[in-house]
UniProtKB/Swiss-Prot annotation:
Domain of life of the native organism: Viruses
Organism, scientific name: Potato leafroll virus (strain Potato/Netherlands/Wageningen/1989) (PLrV)
Protein name: Suppressor of silencing P0
F-box-like domain boundaries: 76-95
Record flagged with keyword Iron-sulfur: no
One record GO biological process: symbiont-mediated suppression of host innate immune response
């Protein structure tokens, strides 16, 4: 189901819809895959490190409600494009993301750069701003000077909001990352699928709670379903209750 490349990236060799069963199979099969990479195929520490980074990035996305894996990559609904870009920056892993109609295809074997992800985030967020500002008389100013001033301000705000890698503490230690992933993959194989899935979710939630999600815990939880800790103030952000309390 998952195959490895010499560069240390992960590929899918079959086509499946995303499901609890697929998530459990891939998560519980990862320790054996890593063992084979090290003992049978002789992957070095750097290759093992890249494999673990790729797995850390892709596993939460396999828990999305809709999508599929195929030989071309991981296919998800297009509206998750922005969140996947943010997650890639947080995770320090930047596979190419191709837009195909109503879906995006995450090409795990085609790495890009953090700079490319930041550029795409700026493009997407700026396009969204322009669309929302359409029809507003003062959306971009009444003259060229105001337009330039507002555009520069927008770009500066967007650049400051783009996440940096949040995995420095966890990713900086190769052995700690490998051990953490292997521990999270442990599950009782003699219990029903739902119990295995729930156990894995909790295991990986503890792992991802170690990461600096930079205020994006709520969107990460919505994207993946992982029960990571979300500060109460983030839950209230933009809500009716928050507006009432602020008045």
């Amino acid at each position: 189901m998952i195959v490895l490349t010499q560069s240390g990236t992960l590929l899918f060799d079959q086509r499946f819809k995303l499901s609890k069963f697929l998530f459990v199979v891939i998560a519980t099969g990862f320790p054996l895959l890593l063992q084979q990479a090290s003992l049978i195929y002789g992957y070095n520490h750097e290759q093992i490190y890249r494999i673990c980074r790729s797995f850390l990035y892709i596993l939460p996305l396999l828990n999305c409600k809709r999508g599929r894996i195929s030989t071309s990559g991981l296919q998800l609904p297009r509206h998750l494009h922005y969140e996947c870009l943010e997650w890639g920056l947080l995770c320090g892993t930047h596979p190419a993301i191709q837009i195909v109609g109503p879906t995006i295809v995450i090409k795990l074997d085609d790495p890009t750069t953090a700079a490319a992800y930041r550029s795409e985030l700026l493009r997407v967020s700026s396009s969204s701003y322009i669309q929302n500002a359409a029809g507003l008389s003062n959306g971009w100013g009444h003259d060229m000077e105001a337009f330039v001033r507002n555009a520069i301000c927008l770009l500066e705000l967007r650049e400051r909001s783009i996440p940096q890698s949040g995995l420095r503490d966890l990713m900086g230690n190769h052995q700690h990352l490998v051990r953490s992933l292997l521990d999270a993959c442990k599950v009782d194989h003699f219990v029903p699928l739902d119990f295995q899935h729930r156990s894995l979710m909790l295991n990986f939630a503890r792992l991802y709670n170690q990461l600096d999600l930079q205020g994006r815990a709520k969107s990460f939880r919505a994207l993946t379903g992982f029960p990571v800790y979300v500060p109460s103030e983030d839950y209230l952000e933009g809500s009716f209750l928050q507006k009432e309390l602020q008045e």
